[in-house]
């Protein structure tokens, strides 16, 4: 692990955008804190009524889609990989490969602050496996295990 990775305990939106390619409307993590390289991190998503998915999910009853909670956990994991391997500005991509055991436990609505805790189960090479738990005010909203593949640019 590089000295820069060891010194980074959090990632603001500028660093997140230097690590992962996602942008509005599909950038689903605002900040990542408590980064322990190669081990764990906590992503933060502030859910607002301005989210574009609320126009159809559901009119008059805005509920943040469960699949986007899983995607937010995956993006948090990609930032963890990027910090762990010092990948900012290097054009690396972390591709979501699979998901197991996804469960949704509570609605996430505008005004909620979603915290995604991700833990590395296996990693350090091209394929990583994670366990993720998303919560609001300490109450479990969703959980899943998922895997991702690291794609480094050639050359």
Curated annotation (Swiss-Prot):
Disulfide cysteine pairs (residue numbers): none
Keyword terms of this UniProt record: Cytoplasm, Lipid A biosynthesis, Lipid biosynthesis, Lipid metabolism, Lyase
Catalytic reactions of this protein: a (3R)-hydroxyacyl-[ACP] = a (2E)-enoyl-[ACP] + H2O
Gene Ontology BP terms: fatty acid biosynthetic process; lipid A biosynthetic process
EC number from the UniProt entry: 4.2.1.59
Active site as annotated: 57
Cellular component annotations (GO), alphabetically ordered: cytoplasm; membrane
Cellular localisation: Cytoplasm
CDD domains: FabZ
Job description of the protein: Involved in unsaturated fatty acids biosynthesis. Catalyzes the dehydration of short chain beta-hydroxyacyl-ACPs and long chain saturated and unsaturated beta-hydroxyacyl-ACPs.
The name this protein goes by in its record: 3-hydroxyacyl-[acyl-carrier-protein] dehydratase FabZ
Provenance organism: Cereibacter sphaeroides (strain ATCC 17023 / DSM 158 / JCM 6121 / CCUG 31486 / LMG 2827 / NBRC 12203 / NCIMB 8253 / ATH 2.4.1.)
Gene: fabZ
């Amino acid at each position: 692990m590089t000295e820069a990775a060891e010194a980074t305990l959090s990632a603001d939106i500028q660093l997140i955008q230097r690590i992962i390619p996602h942008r509005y409307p599909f950038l689903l993590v605002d900040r990542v804190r408590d980064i322990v390289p190669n081990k764990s991190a906590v992503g933060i998503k502030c859910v607002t009524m301005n989210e574009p998915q609320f126009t159809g999910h559901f009119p008059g009853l805005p509920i943040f889609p469960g699949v986007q909670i899983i995607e937010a956990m995956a993006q948090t994991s990609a930032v963890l990989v990027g910090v762990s391997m010092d990948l900012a500005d290097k054009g690396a991509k972390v591709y979501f490969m699979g998901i197991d055991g996804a469960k949704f436990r509570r609605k996430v609505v505008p005004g909620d602050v979603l915290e995604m805790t991700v833990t590395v189960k296996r990693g350090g090479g091209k394929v990583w496996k994670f366990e993720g738990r998303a919560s609001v005010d300490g109450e479990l909203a969703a959980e899943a295990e998922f895997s991702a593949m690291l794609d480094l640019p050639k050359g």
